[in-house]
Amino acid sequence: IISDTIFEIGLTPNRADAMSHYGVARDLLVALKFKKLIESNTFLKDLPKKNDLTFNKNDSLNINIENPELCYRYSGIIIKNINVKPSPIWLKEKLESIGLKPINNIVDITNYTLHYFGQPLHAFDLDKIKGNIINIKSPKKETSFITLDGVERKLDFEDIMICNGEKEMCLAGVFGGLESGVSNTTKNIFIESALFNAISIRKTAKRHGLNTDASFRYERGVDSNMVIPALIKASQLILELSGGEIDSEIFDFYPKKQDDYNFEINFDNVRKIGGFDISNQEIIEILKLLEIELEIVKDNMAKAIVPNFRNDVKREIDIIEEVMRIYGYNNISISDKINSTPSIPVLKNNHNVQQKISNHLVSLGFHEMINNSLTKDLYIINEKEYRNKEIALLNPLSKDT
């Protein structure tokens, strides 16, 4: 890296929306606008749209999703006559700055787009897709599969697999297959952009001991509305850096649309729970900047409609936290009053008796001991009273317990 400024951001697992450069910029824009540090007419760059590409609809694939509960959305595009080669310096430096090793222009573009938008992509060698068929399904029998790292893995019946007309090609949302991946001789490719079930991806990643950039994001939740823009962005870069032409329409199978969340909030609760004075108008302004729409129900009540990319905001308390976060915790003054309600616990009689006996014995000079309930089996092995009654630990920390 010749010269660059790198920010390392610590994210909590619930903030899947900020696991990309676009997501961080979107959140930063909200804070800067509310604090009047930038002009109110400042906006993020428009997301790529279908009319940004020129399509030659000569080729097609038959795509089938076996279980829509495991694959919510599956999209892709065919690009032919590409030239696989090393990436230009600017792209290599971008990837190296975030700790990624450049491989070739096609793979590098998918990685770049992943970190740009937070949407995982995968490139298949089109000529390896036998029968022009893509099936998204789980294995029906025990079988082995060789991943990109050359390791042979036994598939589980719960794994989601991307298959062609003959066999498996990819561990969906986790890791690609060795045979179907892009190589230096690849001329035609199929770019996949999809949305898989987060729980299923997490189980597969843990089962096979794989923690990839793709699985990391799928486990935490991916924005369904970013599937197509990311695919278009990657296609634009591929045409620019490797040549070729688009030879299909955008395939987009979306059998079960992901709806926005909606629930009621009370403006008074924001003030009461947050512990600060904020007007309804300020609350509305913050939520509007966060792209959370409000439909006023009555005076201090409203229905909040939360965009799909904020899968961590599902309750009123989440809204309150968001308002406080953007308003600024440092701007919330600490009360000079402390309210407390002292209470005297009522102890059970047997505990009272025990305490009185303990106190009396201590006053006479005795010492009270609390022994570890865990002990060596050696100590009781010859005691008939305890033989065959001991409870063994499955995973003891040492031989002494």
Which residues does each predicted region cover?
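RNA/tRNA-interacting regions in translation and RNA-turnover enzymes
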Residues: I1-N350, Q355-I357
